[in-house]
């Protein structure tokens, strides 16, 4: 379905520079877009692509349109039509959502015959329950929820209105998922936290005893508009709940330990690991494969770059890095050799300083 720029602006705002009746039926990158597609410029370093794109129209910020120079109607190359908006990237995201919704007919409400639903569960008439879904006693499935094939919902768990669980996602007993959650395939919410008490006697080969499992009797509470990536795991609390606040976005294969609290609007990239009882503030950004130790607190607006390790609390907003970026292999070997010899170099410097001091050289 194609829409005019005028229709888009009525729905999403912005100003038109060019032909308001220009129609676009989809989105594409600047370097691949055709005359019936809408592109966007989010990074000024790609401004040259705007000049050469074949897109029917481009989403662009006012300052970037000024840099582009020529007026829309007077251009002889590149697009003649623009939607001018302060945040082209967010505008693009909303338009993309709209096109997806228009192209995807809603599934009919109902329960697939192969689903297993306990008589004590409550399932809204508007819910969509797919093949081989299991819903245990006391669970509540609210209006408009979609549970795809093989989803498991444990006893006493509530799934908020408008949420969508993709195939093979699982949410254990006693959890609360807020409205409009998106939970991708293979994600697990509410599995046991990693809690074991040591009960050992003796040392070495004479050591006896074992690890005693600590029952995890808390749950998981997830706020509205949260998205959880594929194969991500969020452990239930040991006594109190693990809490994911509103509008948190979690990538694939992330581990969140028991009793964590993730503040609203925080984003966590793939393969990050967050140990138990850690609190992360609001509007934080956690890079891919970052590791955060347990029992630490990150303040609001903290950014942890990819592969960084966090071993202590970081209460102040800012960007924190501990990862070593990739370099030429030979350079790495040289640096590693220097690191191994730092203690020897330190002792040599101390000896030289002492010798200079003995000779009065430090006064020179």
Swiss-Prot record:
Belongs to the transferase hexapeptide repeat family. LpxD subfamily. The gene is lpxD. Homotrimer. Transmembrane segments: none annotated. One of its GO terms (molecular function) is N-acyltransferase activity. It is an enzyme of class 2 (transferase). PROSITE patterns: HEXAPEP_TRANSFERASES. The lineage of its organism: Bacteria, Pseudomonadati, Pseudomonadota, Betaproteobacteria, Burkholderiales. GO terms for biological process: lipid A biosynthetic process. The active site is at 258 (proton acceptor). Catalyzes the N-acylation of UDP-3-O-acylglucosamine using 3-hydroxyacyl-ACP as the acyl donor. Is involved in the biosynthesis of lipid A, a phosphorylated glycolipid that anchors the lipopolysaccharide to the outer membrane of the cell. SUPFAM superfamilies: Trimeric LpxA-like enzymes. Pathway: Bacterial outer membrane biogenesis; LPS lipid A biosynthesis. Keywords: Acyltransferase, Lipid A biosynthesis, Lipid biosynthesis, Lipid metabolism, Repeat, Transferase. This is UDP-3-O-acylglucosamine N-acyltransferase. Pfam families: Hexapep, Hexapep_2, LpxD. GO terms for cellular component: membrane.
